[in-house]
């Protein structure tokens, strides 16, 4: 049985984490499959946006597969870093820097690595049944897939530390109020709302969308002056393209009507 489901309709891909018996916990095979699928979809010009969700009614992802991770820890620090941390950080970096709009459609619990994927995703919608938590401290280690870095940038240092140090979950509405997700939707409407959002973005120039994603993501981790240089470079990259000319021409034509 595949651990990752994929479907593409009308230029929108839906990837579904599919380990329902394990609450879609991320074992190494699933992390690798997700990374490979993201690469394939990014290279496909027919795909304009990607939605990532979880299988079943209970979970987006309960986090890392702890029994598998435990074996890596038993092998020592270097093995744990190689097999677990670097693999997971590589995935969340890939998601954060994705050149197409990637929407996390969080359909249930998003604990540990599931929360870290949500943090990395450029956009996120949450079912009203979703819950988010950083339970790693209960297992004796800090969040290892980027959670100590991205969460404070998203929600602020104090809110992030409260989640990280207490391991207490928050509900979907709390997640939206602090900026972890864009908004909350009814559980049964989650995928349709995610597709609607993807479609709203996909109608724009793919090159312009990619430039916006790069400008915002790269600018987050540099000074404002460096960020402005990134923004200018992304604008300049669009000037030679037909996209900008078509967009300006369409705007001017409407004004003349």
Question: Across the structure, where does each feature detected by a protein language model lie?
Answer:
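C-terminal alpha-helix plus adjacent terminal tail
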Residues: 1-10, 57, 167-173, 192-257
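Conserved CoA-thioester-binding segment of acyl-CoA-metabolizing enzymes
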Residues: 1-53, 79, 86, 90-93
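Terminal peptide-recognition signature
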Residues: 15, 19, 34, 52, ...
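Glycine-centered loop/turn positions within well-structured domains
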Residues: 21, 58, 67, 149, ...
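Activation segment of ePK-like protein kinases, specifically the conserved APE
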Residues: 22, 180, 256-257
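Glycine- (often His-adjacent) and acidic-residue-rich active-site loop
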Residues: 54-91, 110, 140, 223
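Crotonase-fold acyl-CoA enzyme core
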Residues: 93-207, 236-237, 241, 246
């Amino acid at each position: 049985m595949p651990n990752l489901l994929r479907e593409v309709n009308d230029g929108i891909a839906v990837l579904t984490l599919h380990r329902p018996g394990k609450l879609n916990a991320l074992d190494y095979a699933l992390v690798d499959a997700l990374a490979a699928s993201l690469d394939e979809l990014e290279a496909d010009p027919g795909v304009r946006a990607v939605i990532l969700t979880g299988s079943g009614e209970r979970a987006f992802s309960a986090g890392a597969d702890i029994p598998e991770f435990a074996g890596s820890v038993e092998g020592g620090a270097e093995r744990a870093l190689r097999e677990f941390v670097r693999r997971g950080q590589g995935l969340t970096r890939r998601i954060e820097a994705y050149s197409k709009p990637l929407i996390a459609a969080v359909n249930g619990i998003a604990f540990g690595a599931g929360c870290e994927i949500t943090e990395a995703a450029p956009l996120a919608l949450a079912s009203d049944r979703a819950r988010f938590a950083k339970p790693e401290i209960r297992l004796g280690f800090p969040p290892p897939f980027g959670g100590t870095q991205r969460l404070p940038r998203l929600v602020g240092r104090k809110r992030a530390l409260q989640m990280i140090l207490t391991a207490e979950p928050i509900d979907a509405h709390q997640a939206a109020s602090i900026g972890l997700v864009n908004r909350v939707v009814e559980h049964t409407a989650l995928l349709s709302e995610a597709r609607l959002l993807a479609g709203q973005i996909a109608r724009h120039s793919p090159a312009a969308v990619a430039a916006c994603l790069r400008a915002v993501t790269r600018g987050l981790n540099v000074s404002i002056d460096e960020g402005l240089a990134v923004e200018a470079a992304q604008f300049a990259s669009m000037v030679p393209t037909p996209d900008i000319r078509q967009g300006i021409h369409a705007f001017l034509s409407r004004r003349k009507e």
